[in-house]
UniProtKB/Swiss-Prot annotation:
Protein name: Cytochrome c2
Annotated family: Belongs to the cytochrome c family.
Record key words, sorted: Electron transport, Heme, Iron, Metal-binding, Photosynthesis, Transport
PTM info: Binds 1 heme c group covalently per subunit.
Binding of heme c, residues: C12, C15, H16, M61
GO biological process, alphabetically ordered: photosynthesis
Function summary: Cytochrome c2 is found mainly in purple, non-sulfur, photosynthetic bacteria where it functions as the electron donor to the oxidized bacteriochlorophyll in the photophosphorylation pathway. However, it may also have a role in the respiratory chain and is found in some non-photosynthetic bacteria.
Originating organism: Rubrivivax gelatinosus
Membrane-spanning ranges: none
GO molecular function: electron transfer activity; heme binding; iron ion binding
Length: 85
């Protein structure tokens, strides 16, 4: 599966879209915030796993457990998001 398909299957697309803001920031907005930051992939993975609030607004992002997306697939999705122009 492609990273986009993995993200959709994991439920990411419920809140996140490639370029348009939904309930959460677009993949493009996420890439813009984290691109070039040391440790960005690990930080993003932690926020996906544990959930977060206040990074892009007041609406909390719920935790995404390994049962929904494996660590290996999550890494593929994060790498793909960071390559978003």
């Amino acid at each position: 599966a492609t990273p986009a398909e993995l993200a959709t299957k994991a439920g990411c697309a419920v809140c996140h879209q490639p370029t348009a803001k939904g309930l959460g920031p677009s993949y493009q907005e996420i890439a813009k915030k984290y691109k070039g930051q040391a440790g960005a992939p690990a930080l993003m993975a932690e926020r996906v796993r544990k959930g977060s609030v206040g990074i892009f607004g007041k609406l909390p992002m719920t935790p995404t457990p390994p049962a929904r997306i494996s660590d290996a697939d999550l890494k593929l999705v994060i790498d793909w998001i960071l390559k978003t122009p």
